[in-house]
Curated annotation (Swiss-Prot):
Gene: GIT2
GO molecular function: GTPase activator activity; small GTPase binding; zinc ion binding
One GO BP annotation of this record: brain development
ANK repeats: 132-161, 166-195, 199-228
Stored InterPro entries: Ankyrin_rpt (IPR002110), Ankyrin_rpt-contain_sf (IPR036770), ARFGAP/RecO (IPR037278), ArfGAP_dom (IPR001164), ArfGAP_dom_sf (IPR038508), GIT-like (IPR047161), GIT1/2_CC (IPR032352), GIT1_C (IPR022018)
Coiled-coil residues: 437-478
Biased composition (Low complexity): 555-569
Protein species of origin: Homo sapiens
Residue intervals of the Arf-GAP domain: 1-124
Name of protein: ARF GTPase-activating protein GIT2
Amino acid sequence: MSKRLRSSEVCADCSGPDPSWASVNRGTFLCDECCSVHRSLGRHISQVRHLKHTPWPPTLLQMVETLYNNGANSIWEHSLLDPASIMSGRRKANPQDKVHPNKAEFIRAKYQMLAFVHRLPCRDDDSVTAKDLSKQLHSSVRTGNLETCLRLLSLGAQANFFHPEKGNTPLHVASKAGQILQAELLAVYGADPGTQDSSGKTPVDYARQGGHHELAERLVEIQYELTDRLAFYLCGRKPDHKNGQHFIIPQMADSSLDLSELAKAAKKKLQSLSNHLFEELAMDVYDEVDRRETDAVWLATQNHSALVTETTVVPFLPVNPEYSSTRNQGRQKLARFNAHEFATLVIDILSDAKRRQQGSSLSGSKDNVELILKTINNQHSVESQDNDQPDYDSVASDEDTDLETTASKTNRQKSLDSDLSDGPVTVQEFMEVKNALVASEAKIQQLMKVNNNLSDELRIMQKKLQTLQSENSNLRKQATTNVYQVQTGSEYTDTSNHSSLKRRPSARGSRPMSMYETGSGQKPYLPMGEASRPEESRMRLQPFPAHIGRSALVTSSSSLPSFPSTLSWSRDESARRASRLEKQNSTPESDYDNTPNDMEPDGMGSSRKGRQRSMVWPGDGLVPDTAEPHVAPSPTLPSTEDVIRKTEQITKNIQELLRAAQENKHDSYIPCSERIHVAVTEMAALFPKKPKSDMVRTSLRLLTSSAYRLQSECKKTLPGDPGSPTDVQLVTQQVIQCAYDIAKAAKQLVTITTKENNN
């Protein structure tokens, strides 16, 4: 396969890049994840092969590539290409989708249910429709249009259809026309190369008469594909059909199973099976060989990046609904056979297939017809099961059964003697070493990947630790350099002398400090009736460095849902809030519509938008609120340190509430809401009963009302009337909204307090 062709290929099911598997009967290429789902469906739905690590007949691979390049995938996704399918909500899987359930459900609908295949108009008789389709297939195989034939086969055309007027099958027509790729496609869908037409000729005869020698040789290989695959599984070689040799039969030498009466009885019952039952058993063993070989390739090609992956494991043959329950159960029990037992069964099948093909007679009497699977399964005496148990039971682990002890253990080596081999070949050793090597390589890759992941995580943790230590050191330095110095004597004036205080212009270029930054330094607490001069605050306050803009305490809640943290915000957010405080009116950020949005006249008498009423110093002529005329408005606010300390308590309790919501611990809602309410009450008590600023009043109102709403919503989680169940999901949304409002109000109060106290 050319590199240019392979680089442009994508998975037919999820459009992932660089597919490494192929579905032979569907004409598509698959990625690893989609292939795992195909394997779980069974070979009757999808026949998967690895593009590099599986031996391919050249013409078979060419047939799959031709189908893929000619758009065979559009056959299985016909309705998805219709624009109307977008309106119906159906869509194709994406590479980022999870294997379960997204990709698995789509693949089952696409190939097992054929939900997206173009449907013909309904007719009263389905047999007439199938007959018409088969006649169209009979006419199409003489051309090289593979996609048309695959479309007819997907609609129900029969690959072995015998044309009543022409007296032959589609494979006869394709062989006579020399269409080797059409012959490959028909053989995949069950066409028999040994079928004779009305003249007694086979497709091989027509291929040789037409001079298509490569096609004739390939048809012979297809005719012996089952026995060739079984022989190749045991000894890694295939017969030389060109020279007339069609069977390679390894012989078990000096084996205890061959000498046991149980093995002799099993072999005798195998020989007594009718041709029909023997064909069924041989096909089941062929499917089991395909499963084991695909398993070996699967383990060797996976990177084992995780201890548990989403990809599907296929421990035994999947159920085929066209087979009986007894046959499906017997097919699944083939997975119990260890390497030696399965090799013995394969050799017996090869021997009897050769005998039946050559027409040799049996010596001895014939027993009653009975499936060989039931007899050989009696060797597992410890794991014996009743046939009345439910079908498709789980297959036990592949543990080898101890063989009967013999007199000399040194003479127990089991070897295979092929009729063309130069020396003995040990089946058990070959299979055990092969399986052990594959398992060891997979384990090594898995451990190396896990080791690399752990090393990467360790490096990341070390970097995070160094970053936290550096930030902690910087914060300590800033705390020592920015401590407010408590001045004595004339640095504070009597608050009664309001004329000595002047309003300081707002510093538009500075950004408001985050709550964690402000809390790092210690500022003297001013009583309710006192305030520091703006000039002195301006001289003593130094801005924090730009790199300290986010609190390290919030990292513990990074796994919680998106939530406005009251402990930190980004530099851009801080600058935006500072600009909003200085340039806009006094309306705070709120989700409610009853917030006042009016103008305040400045000292010159002109109405200007953007003057902050909360940034007013005593003596500026405040107008008392008419709501409570007996309470005089207070011009002072609590210290920033006290507000931050209470806000941190609120934030900690909100984080506990959100963790409870994330973990569905609804019984923790009420205790968390009570702790939040207590913290909110303590924070509200810091502020005067009648604050001067509209922003402070609005934020306090939002803070307290949201706390009461939170308690009310959390009480809804208590078990109530059984007739009216509570929608827990809706309650959780309301609880999160209330917590959001509380955090938002607390952040507004911190911003206002920080701005006021810095002026």
